[in-house]
Curated annotation (Swiss-Prot):
Compartments reported by the entry: Cell membrane
Protein name: Galactose/N-acetyl-D-galactosamine lectin light subunit 1
Biological role stated in the UniProt entry: Light subunit of a heterodimeric lectin; the heavy subunit binds galactose and N-acetyl-D-galactosamine of host glycoproteins and thus mediates adhesion to host cells.
Protein topology in the membrane: Peripheral membrane protein
Highest classification ranks of the organism: Eukaryota, Amoebozoa, Evosea, Archamoebae, Mastigamoebida
Domain of life: Eukaryota
One CC-aspect GO term: plasma membrane
InterPro entries associated with the record: Gal_GalNac_light_su_1 (IPR035310)
Main location: membrane
Protein keywords: Cell membrane, Disulfide bond, Glycoprotein, Lectin, Membrane, Signal
Assembly description: Heterodimer composed of a 170 kDa heavy subunit (hgl) and a 31/35 kDa light subunit (lgl); disulfide-linked.
Cystine bridges: none
UniProt-annotated glycosylation sites, renumbered to this chain: N205, N261
One MF annotation (Gene Ontology) recorded for this entry: carbohydrate binding
């Protein structure tokens, strides 16, 4: 197993320009009259386009049923891709020694004030971007009910744009109540398969039933074999996992990102058929 050592500094509460992100003057929920999505813009805070500012409380975790500062099961984590974009292969120990650049899950914007209100067509991708010390947007949390929360924006979680379908991209989206059956809730639930022995997973080789085209299908579960993968349990007819796009792949675009250029190299993450050996599907959690 590759040992990934990262030196991480962390800042909280202030933006890159020194302003207080939690200021009561932040225009929560307001429409932005000066927005223009028809010309190029970047992920920088003074360029990124916002059609409507996010709702009040988006930066706060105090509405949860736990006290975040005292939570003993909350884990702040960076998810590093094990795919080396320099060699187009899986990272090796030698690659790490040489200092080849690691890409980690990050936002498509550079400052958390750029989080948008939940409007279709303006969804915001979670991208792979180079590791940057002090960037709080690269921190996530293992949350209850198989959800993955942005540490800097606790009301936003991993989601799949348009549902758990092949090629659909990973986004952030407002967190549904964990026990809710509201539409889209199951798209916010994922299984990170830790590299424990397969037999340690009680689900392995168990069966589940589902209906497809009016017929009952019995499926044998195999997802514990996809070590260090994010598995999408919502789909039962096919095993889907997160997968990073290649540098040569095109991007999925919509109104909110068709003219976006990130200030660093970035790659989308999509739902793809699971492969135990595909390096672009392997993610290493680095706890901090």
């Amino acid at each position: 197993m590759i040992i990934l050592v990262l030196l991480i500094s962390y800042s909280f509460g202030k933006t890159q320009d020194g302003k207080d992100q939690l200021s009561p003057n932040y225009p929560y929920g307001k429409m932005n009259k000066d927005v223009n999505f028809n010309k190029p813009f970047t992920s920088a805070v003074d360029s990124y386009q916002i059609q409507q500012y996010a709702e009040n409380g988006v930066f706060s975790a105090n509405q949860e049923n736990y006290v975040r500062a005292k939570c003993k099961t909350c884990c702040r984590v960076i998810f590093a891709s094990d795919y080396n974009y320099k060699t187009n292969t899986q990272f090796t120990d030698e690659d790490d020694k040489k200092g080849d650049e690691r890409y980690v899950m990050d936002m498509e914007f550079d400052d958390k004030r750029s989080v948008r209100f939940r409007n279709g067509g303006y969804e915001q991708n979670i991208l792979l971007r180079p590791l940057k010390q002090g960037n709080e947007l690269q921190f996530f949390e293992f949350a209850p009910y198989r959800m993955y929360t942005s540490y800097a924006i606790p009301k936003r979680v991993h989601d799949i744009r348009g549902g758990a379908n092949e090629g659909a991209t990973l986004i952030i989206w407002p967190k549904n109540p964990p026990l809710s059956d509201a539409p889209g809730t199951r798209n916010q639930r994922f299984v990170y398969v830790h590299p424990y022995p397969t037999e340690w997973y009680p689900e392995y080789n168990s069966t589940t039933k589902y209906t497809q085209n009016g017929k009952t299908v019995i499926k044998t579960l195999k997802w514990p074999t996809y070590k260090r993968h994010f598995y999408l349990p919502y789909r039962l007819d096919v095993d889907l996992c997160y997968q990073a796009r290649k540098a040569t792949d095109g991007r999925s675009t919509w109104t909110g990102n068709k003219n976006l250029n990130t200030t660093s190299k970035s790659y989308q993450i999509i739902a793809s058929r699971c492969s135990a050996t595909e390096a672009r599907q392997i993610f290493i959690p680095v706890f901090a």
